[in-house]
A protein has these predicted regions:
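Non-transmembrane, aqueous-exposed alpha-helical and coiled segments at domain scale
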Residues: 1-232
Length: 232
């Protein structure tokens, strides 16, 4: 979805229950999702040339959920949202809701985009250097998720990770969690640079280039896995 650079990580299983998500435009809430049905819909959106959370079929969402604009003055908190995310208020601003979602009792908090959303209680927002997210950022000791998965970089400060871990949370680091994707991108970019020169020279057609790229999938995958095994 728009702004969710590494959200494809949530296409790895049809058993996941995606209860909330957000990007720079919208907040997605599905308090009690059907894992299989919502997986199919996420996959449909992922395969569109361009997509936003507003393209999501809201008819399959559970009661009390919805897709809300981050520019709204306030958002009504349904009974289902209150129960799922342990929220007491009847209304919240979008920023207040995002702050509550980050602190919600869930199994997995997945960072799929850009921004630093978790710091340590000993750090100031100025220390973080991400002013756009100052109002919604939380401290590591406020997280109630069991695990943080970092598809994107710099989602937590290092001190924030330490504080989360000291309070019983599980996390690696961003450079470990997303190492496979970064390594895969490195291979992809270098191969495409090489092949583009061959195509421009007239020694290969675009169709032949695309067929060759597809045929290299398993080989590149094995190289990426090998590099990551050595790294971690």
């Amino acid at each position: 979805m728009a702004g969710d650079v590494f959200g494809n990580g949530l296409l790895m299983s049809d058993k996941l229950q995606l209860v909330a998500a957000f990007n720079h435009l919208h907040i997605f809430i599905d308090p009690n999702p059907n894992p299989a049905t919502s997986f199919v819909e996420r996959k449909r959106l992922f395969e569109l040339p361009r997509s936003a959370w507003t393209d999501y079929d809201t008819s399959i969402m559970s009661e009390g959920g919805g897709i809300f604009s981050r520019s709204a003055k306030s958002i009504a908190i349904s009974p289902q949202m209150k129960e799922r995310f342990d929220i007491q208020a009847d209304k919240l601003t979008p920023t207040e809701l995002l702050n509550a979602l980050l602190k919600a009792p869930v199994d997995l908090l997945w960072n799929g985009g850009i921004g630093t959303y978790v710091k340590a209680s000993t750090e100031s927002h100025a220390d973080v250097g991400d002013k756009a997210n100052d109002a919604l950022r939380v401290n590591g000791n406020e997280l109630r998720c069991k695990v943080v998965g970092e598809g994107g970089n710099l989602g937590m400060t290092q001190l924030g990770r330490v504080e989360f871990g000291l309070n019983g949370g599980g996390s690696n680091t961003d450079f470990i969690d997303n190492a496979g994707g970064v390594d895969c991108s490195d291979h992809e970019v270098n191969i495409k640079i090489l092949l583009n020169e061959v195509v421009q020279a007239g020694d290969m057609t675009d169709k032949q280039r695309n067929q060759l790229l597809a045929s290299m999938t398993d080989e590149v995958g094995n190289l990426v896995l090998g590099n990551n095994y050595k790294q971690t």
